[in-house]
């Protein structure tokens, strides 16, 4: 049996040169990185203040 291979290309009629979409994508990546850092800082604060309670609550919810 012969297998048919299809090469997918993205975007359709768009140009390959980065433009406004590239700048918007960069801004989005920076915003996501900033939000992730803020969330990790918040988790660190909770663990520093109350690590034992955090672990106890995690185990009660089914964590291992």
From Swiss-Prot:
Q: Where is the composition biased (Basic and acidic residues)?
A: 1-11
Report the coiled-coil segments. 24-52
**What pathway does the annotation place this protein in?**
Protein degradation; proteasomal Pup-dependent pathway
- Residues recorded as bearing Deamidated glutamine in the entry: 64
Q: Where is this cross-link: Isoglutamyl lysine isopeptide (Gln-Lys) (interchain with K-? in acceptor proteins)?
A: 64
Region feature (ARC ATPase binding) = 21-58
Molecular function terms, GO-annotated: proteasome binding; protein tag activity
Among Pfam families, the record links this protein to: Pup (PF05639)
| Single GO biological process annotation from the record | protein pupylation
Record keywords: Coiled coil included? yes
Maturation and modification: Is modified by deamidation of its C-terminal glutamine to glutamate by the deamidase Dop, a prerequisite to the subsequent pupylation process.
Segments for region (Disordered): 1-37
Annotated family: Belongs to the prokaryotic ubiquitin-like protein family.
Q: What is known of its domains?
A: The N-terminal unstructured half of Pup provides a signal required to initiate unfolding and degradation by the proteasome but is not needed for pupylation, while the C-terminal helical half of Pup interacts with ARC to target proteins to the proteasome.
Q: What does this protein do?
A: Protein modifier that is covalently attached to lysine residues of substrate proteins, thereby targeting them for proteasomal degradation. The tagging system is termed pupylation.
The record's section on NCBIfam families has: pupylate_cterm (TIGR03687)
Would you tell me the protein name for this molecule? Prokaryotic ubiquitin-like protein Pup
Specify the species. Rhodococcus jostii (strain RHA1)
**Which gene produces this protein?**
pup
């Amino acid at each position: 049996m012969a297998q048919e291979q299809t090469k997918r290309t993205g975007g359709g009629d768009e140009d390959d040169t980065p433009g406004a979409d590239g700048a918007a994508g960069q801004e989005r990546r920076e915003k996501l990185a900033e939000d992730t850092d803020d969330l990790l800082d918040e988790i660190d604060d909770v663990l520093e203040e109350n690590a034992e309670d955090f672990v106890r609550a995690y185990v009660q919810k089914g964590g291992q």
